[in-house]
């Protein structure tokens, strides 16, 4: 099936499906969930279900029964809503400039002008305003993840050393995995745990009966990748817990694990493929300078933005970036003219990296908002670097941090969901 533009946009930018415009399925709308003081309607749910079906079909995955998918998508929408409400309560706001840049990037990636993007979206029944709203939602959740979770994740030298030792014993094998997660709430009682255990074993029975893993994942999994067939992509041995690597070493390609109980809930994993990872580890590195104006109780968002605009104006009129960094930057790199040295992807927060990689060498960015404040960025160089020897430890640390970030974020979202007031009315007619 030929993918729509929307599916391409999802694949290139979003981690979850972009919502299509609400298309009434019934003449009378109704509330299907209450999340604190907000509601999710039947028509909103149906629009997201329709988009989920398109996404699955684009992956050549047969969707589960619609009523099953409705329940899965509704839970996704509830989880999104509690995060968006939390962000709003903390004053987290995505500026229009960030949305403008994301739209421009989408058009560029698909080799379209803005007018061409509008026209192509219209063919898929999507307005540009709706796309912008979806992008704003995804950027909000992404920034929330960084501000609430990233600062709490640490990786010790001993963890890195142990991972490298394990990788050597595993001959640097890489694994392509898929997963099904039946999440267990933090304060679940024995009855809830038993019900969830029955759910995951029903999923296991469907797999044993020959149902495709991707279809079972879409029907049962609570993980964000459920509607992507549970696909986790390629994972190196260093990015996985040692006990799990030992299990994978004994499995054949195509096999599923038994049900595995973890702190998050019940997992079933599929070993889709595996390969030797002994080739050189080439990473793209960037050499940026930056100027940071922080926001805090004494400096408002508007004041910080005005200050960074003034600094940029001086640079555009001929002032040297390094001199301005020494004078105005509120980062520890100011003494070095804002020089951050050579950095790898994953070293910096996503908003900074996204702006950095799009900049031509020698060009000063527009102001960039991150959880730390407002930045100006100047890229002085970029290169591909082999990190398989001297810099392997750095790469391993990044992999471990990414895994711990994923788990910490999942745990944090679960706690946020459990603490919210949620009423579901999907079964009410």
Swiss-Prot record:
Keywords: Chaperone, Isomerase, Periplasm, Repeat, Rotamase, Signal. The keyword Chaperone applies. PANTHER family: CHAPERONE SURA. SUPFAM superfamilies: FKBP-like, Triger factor/SurA peptide-binding domain-like. The gene is surA. It comes from the Bacteria. HAMAP family: Chaperone_SurA. It holds the Pfam family Rotamase_3. Coiled coil: none annotated. GO terms for cellular component: outer membrane-bounded periplasmic space. The keyword Aminoacyl-tRNA synthetase does not apply. It catalyses: [protein]-peptidylproline (omega=180) = [protein]-peptidylproline (omega=0). One of its GO terms (biological process) is protein stabilization. One of its GO terms (molecular function) is peptide binding. Its EC number is 5.2.1.8. Chaperone involved in the correct folding and assembly of outer membrane proteins. Recognizes specific patterns of aromatic residues and the orientation of their side chains, which are found more frequently in integral outer membrane proteins. May act in both early periplasmic and late outer membrane-associated steps of protein maturation. The PPIase activity resides only in the second parvulin domain. The N-terminal region and the C-terminal tail are necessary and sufficient for the chaperone activity of SurA. The PPIase activity is dispensable for SurA to function as a chaperone. The N-terminal region and the C-terminal tail are also required for porin recognition. This is Chaperone SurA. The lineage of its organism: Bacteria, Pseudomonadati, Pseudomonadota, Betaproteobacteria, Neisseriales. InterPro entries: OMP_Chaperone_SurA, PPIase_dom_sf, PPIase_PpiC, PPIase_SurA, SurA_N, Trigger_fact/SurA_dom_sf. Residues 172-273, 283-381 form the PpiC domain. It is found in: Periplasm. Residues 1-19 form the signal peptide.
């Amino acid at each position: 099936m030929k993918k729509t533009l929307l599916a391409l946009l999802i694949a290139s930018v979003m981690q979850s499906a972009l919502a299509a415009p609400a298309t009434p399925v019934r003449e009378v709308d109704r509330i299907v969930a209450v999340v604190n003081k907000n509601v999710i309607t039947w028509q909103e749910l149906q629009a997201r279900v329709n988009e989920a079906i398109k996404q699955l079909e684009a992956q050549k995955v047969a969707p589960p029964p619609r009523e099953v998918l409705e329940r899965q998508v509704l839970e996704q929408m509830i989880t999104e809503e509690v995060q968006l409400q939390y962000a709003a309560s903390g004053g987290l706001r995505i500026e229009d400039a960030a949305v403008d840049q994301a739209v421009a990037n989408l058009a560029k990636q698909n080799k379209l002008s803005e007018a061409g993007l509008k026209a192509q979206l219209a063919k898929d029944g999507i307005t540009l305003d709706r796309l912008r709203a979806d992008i704003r939602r995804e950027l909000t959740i992404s920034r929330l993840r960084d501000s609430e979770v990233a600062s709490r994740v640490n990786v010790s030298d001993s963890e890195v050393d142990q991972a490298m030792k394990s990788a050597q014993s595993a001959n640097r094998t890489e694994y392509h995995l898929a997963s099904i997660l039946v999440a267990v709430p933090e304060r679940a009682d024995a009855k809830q745990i038993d019900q969830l255990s029955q759910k995951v074993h029903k999923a296991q029975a469907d797999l044993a009966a020959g149902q495709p893993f991707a279809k079972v994942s879409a029907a049962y999994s609570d993980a964000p990748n459920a509607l992507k067939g549970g696909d986790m992509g390629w994972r190196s041995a260093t990015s996985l817990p040692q006990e799990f690597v030992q299990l994978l070493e004994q499995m054949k390609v195509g096999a599923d694990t038994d049900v595995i109980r973890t702190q998050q809930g019940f997992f079933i994993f599929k070993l889709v493929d595996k390969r030797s990872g002994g080739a050189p580890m080439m990473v793209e590195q960037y050499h940026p300078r930056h100027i940071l104006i922080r926001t805090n109780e004494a400096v408002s968002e508007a004041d910080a933005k005005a200050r960074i605009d003034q600094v940029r104006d001086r640079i555009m009129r001929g002032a040297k970036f390094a001199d301005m960094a020494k004078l105005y930057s509120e980062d520890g790199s100011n003494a070095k003219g804002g020089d951050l040295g050579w950095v790898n992807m994953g070293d910096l927060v996503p908003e900074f990296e996204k702006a950095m990689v799009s900049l031509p060498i020698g060009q000063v960015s527009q102001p960039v908002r991150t959880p730390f404040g407002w930045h100006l960025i100047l890229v002085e160089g970029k290169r591909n670097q082999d990190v398989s020897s001297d810099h392997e430890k750095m790469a391993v640390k990044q992999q471990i941090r990414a895994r711990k970030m994923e788990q910490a974020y999942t745990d944090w979202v679960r706690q946020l969901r459990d603490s919210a007031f949620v009423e579901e009315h999907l079964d009410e007619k």
